[in-house]
Design a protein with these regions (language model features):
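Active-site catalytic microenvironments in core metabolic enzymes, especially phosphate/sugar-handling
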Residues: 1-113
Length: 113
């Protein structure tokens, strides 16, 4: 992502961080799942790929207004999966000798104004 989105207090002290890559932060059919994980694991910050803005942003903003340490960093779907896909190419190549394996950067699909 050519920009990083942040919700919550960017200056707060952070002790616990969770990561949901790609579409995992959409909740796998349960859009409340990221909030449930933040509460259950007592996470200060959730680093996300892609989000449902009307739920996760509202939760983080509401929690911050109530004095809880909560923030979210949204990096983008492709960018959060990129690290794993680079590793996948390295991991897969020895398993398929003779077959060319390489990482192709999907790049940021959006352009910004």
């Amino acid at each position: 992502m050519d920009a990083v989105q942040v919700v919550g207090d960017g200056q707060m002290e952070c002790t616990r961080v969770g990561v949901l890559v790609g579409g995992g932060s959409l909740g796998f059919g349960d859009e409340a799942m990221p909030m449930k994980v933040m509460r259950a694991k007592d996470l200060d910050v959730m680093v996300c790929g892609e989000i449902t803005e009307w739920t996760l942003c509202a939760y983080v903003n509401d929690a911050s207004q109530l004095g809880k340490r909560r923030a979210m960093i949204v990096i983008g779907h492709e960018r959060t999966e990129e690290w794993g896909m680079k590793h996948m190419a390295t991991w897969l190549a020895p398993l398929v000798p003779g077959v060319p394996v390489s990482f192709l950067n999907a790049k940021e699909p959006f352009w910004y104004v």
